[in-house]
């Protein structure tokens, strides 16, 4: 028997909140005022974790090269093509580091961080927490512009009709574009790879030699890695790229999946009791509000209990 529960919450926390369903299905909707996005999580988010008894050190974004180079970066970097085939890496502080054009680079973004990278062709990549991107120092002499992603990234690709852009996900799985914007979610252990098109058109192939699926804006292709099946569906693409603007946006997402996302965003460990496995939530919250705010919101709109034990956040 379904029942509907309404609880009053503070107006400063949300403009609309609803709780509906049975003990196995809870939906909480949250809408907050848009603010200028910042680096996530912000210092106050780390302070929240300290106050809650969770010790978190600010993790480092690291860029490495196949020749042994290792750089610690902050929030953004840009590859710039110079005269005579030279390439330089410019950091957000203005520091420039010359790079050999044949270098293969990799940037690793740990849990608790995000990073923005401009490639030498002007294409932009936003990397979410817990992600890795492999790419060449320059595409100048390449017939294709190829990169490899593990984790989640949002791409805005500069159009080049002579050189398609290729995003490789492993095992021949590939996305080919000319000029467009799209989100790729390919975290290890998730069991599926999801690509969502925002603008333009992309071609998707699940493996080498497989028939290519062409996506239009607001379409999504999902590959089940265990079953090997591919499905295309219509979605609101803005939901899937909202993270790069500083939003945590979730629709009918299970609490275990949401807890896993919170763990990546804030670099913490979140455990969910078995009884909450089928609870689902929908909402849109600024990530820089901090994890304490988000967990309190879940408690305010449901019977979820949040507590910290031995540095681990437990939801029961």
Stretches found by the model and what they are:
Residues 1-3:
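N-terminal intrinsically disordered, acidic low-complexity segments at the extreme N-terminus
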Residues 5, 10-22, 31-316:
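A residue-level detector for the "anchor" residue at the start of short, highly conserved motifs
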Residues 25-26:
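Catalytic cores of soluble metabolic enzymes centered on carboxylation/carboxyl-transfer
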């Amino acid at each position: 028997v379904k029942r509907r529960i309404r609880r009053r919450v503070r107006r400063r926390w949300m403009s609309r909140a609803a709780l509906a369903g049975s003990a196995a299905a809870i939906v909480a909707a949250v809408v907050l005022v848009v603010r200028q996005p910042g680096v996530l999580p912000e210092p106050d988010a780390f302070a929240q974790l300290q106050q809650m008894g969770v010790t978190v050190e600010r993790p480092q974004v690291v860029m490495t090269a196949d020749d042994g180079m290792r750089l610690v970066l902050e929030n953004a970097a840009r590859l710039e093509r110079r005269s005579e085939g030279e390439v330089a890496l410019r950091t957000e502080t203005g520091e420039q580091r010359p790079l050999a054009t044949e270098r293969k680079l990799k940037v690793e973004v740990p849990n608790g961080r995000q990073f923005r990278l401009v490639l030498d062709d002007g294409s932009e990549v936003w990397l979410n927490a817990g992600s890795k991107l492999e790419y060449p120092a320059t595409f100048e002499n390449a017939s294709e512009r190829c990169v490899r992603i593990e984790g989640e990234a949002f791409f805005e690709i500069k159009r080049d009709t002579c050189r398609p852009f290729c995003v490789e996900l492993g095992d021949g799985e590939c996305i080919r574009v000319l000029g467009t914007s799209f989100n790729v979610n390919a975290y290890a252990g998730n069991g599926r790879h999801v690509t969502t098109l925002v603008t333009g058109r992309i071609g998707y192939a699940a493996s080498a030699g497989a028939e290519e699926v062409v996506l239009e804006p607001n379409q999504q292709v999902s590959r089940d890695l265990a079953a090997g099946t591919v499905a295309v569906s219509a979605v609101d693409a803005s939901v899937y790229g909202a993270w790069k603007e500083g939003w945590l946006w979730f629709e009918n997402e299970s609490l275990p999946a949401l807890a896993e996302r919170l763990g990546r965003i804030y670099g913490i460990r979140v455990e969910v009791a078995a009884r909450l496995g089928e609870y689902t939530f929908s909402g849109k919250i600024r990530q820089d509000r901090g994890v304490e705010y988000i967990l309190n919101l879940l408690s305010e709109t449901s019977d979820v209990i949040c507590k910290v034990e031995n540095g681990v956040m437990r939801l029961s």
